[in-house]
Amino acid sequence: MKAAVLFQSLTGNTRKAGELIAANLQQEGWGITTVTPMKELQLAAIQEADVVIVGTWVHGLFVVGQAPFGIGAINHLPAMRGKLAATFCTFALNPGTTLDRLDTAVSYLGADVIGGLALHRSKLSEHTEEFAARLVANVPVRA
């Protein structure tokens, strides 16, 4: 399997999470077509991937509501019809409904979102291992 990892990062936590996810998938024998910010994406990286992983950070105040940062950038990604996708978000306090909203945005691109995980910024190592393990377990093996 091949994966493309796309992210939006402000402080570097989401970038680090994307890099750790890619490294964990490589340990499972997956190929990685890219690990890159969404704004620097090359279309070929999505075309070559079997699974597109989209990650961002949680934006907003705990009392007002949280949302995935950069939803506009996600909405402008190329169509992903026929692609499997997984999502992740990094957070400090509480992700709220960020992951659900991220799943919805990626689904609108035509991807079949098979899951996601909210990753606490102080537990990136263990949470990214869990993310990769869940992804490997839930992606159908190609014939």
Where are these regions (language model features)?
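Extreme N-terminal starter segment of soluble prokaryotic enzymes
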Residues: M1-A4
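Short hydrophobic segments within beta-strands
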Residues: L6-Q8, F88
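FMN-binding flavodoxin-like domain, especially the glycine-rich phosphate-binding loop
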Residues: N13-K16, N24-V35, A45-A143
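Conserved SAM/SAH-binding loop
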Residues: P37-L41
